[in-house]
Regions:
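Glycine- and acidic-residue-biased ligand/ion/polar-headgroup-sensing regions
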Residues: 50-52, 56-62
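Short strand-connecting beta-turns/loops that link adjacent beta-strands
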Residues: 28-30, 50, 94-95
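Ligand-binding loop in jelly-roll beta-barrel domains
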Residues: 83-108
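Structural motif
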Residues: 61-63, 70, 86, 96
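Short acidic-glycine-tyrosine-enriched beta hairpin
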Residues: 69-83
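Conserved short histidine dyad/triad with adjacent acidic residue
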Residues: 33-48
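A short, N-terminal "cap"/entry segment at the start of jelly-roll beta-barrel domains
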Residues: 1-31, 44, 110-118
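Histidine-centered metal-chelating micro-motifs
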Residues: 42-44, 63, 79, 83-88
Length: 118
């Protein structure tokens, strides 16, 4: 793949029952998705054992718990954190919230750990 241009606004999609995730791209080394939240929707607390993560807020305000710290991230801001850090994403506002996240593909991390390289 040479390159890919994604119109994040055109890819937005919402559902009343749960947040909607859409894959932007997934390569051998990197992946990215957008997640769209109606007011009151959230992603449960979780962690990624090997992957660092960066979350960019495209629209509205995302409230996150990151390693037991509440963080408010407004549109146009990005937050990143190391692997194995518990985190969640919540839309506590009255408007729709859209985030984009970016992570290293866990398969490449496993290959590096196993000595197979990229």
């Amino acid at each position: 793949m040479k390159h890919q241009v994604s119109d994040l606004h055109a890819l937005k999609d919402f559902a009343l029952d749960k947040r909607v995730r859409k894959m932007l791209f997934k390569t051998d080394q990197l992946w990215s998705e957008i997640a769209c939240y109606e007011p009151g929707q959230s992603t449960v607390m979780h962690s990624h054992p090997r992957e660092e993560e960066a979350i960019y807020v495209l629209e509205s305000i995302a409230t996150m718990s990151i390693a037991d710290e509440n963080v408010t991230v407004p549109a146009g801001s990005i937050v990143n954190f190391p692997a194995n850090v518990p985190h969640d994403v919540r839309n506590l506002g009255s408007e729709r919230c859209v985030i984009m996240f970016l992570k290293v593909n866990p398969k490449i991390l496993k290959a590096d750990r196993d000595g197979k390289g990229a």
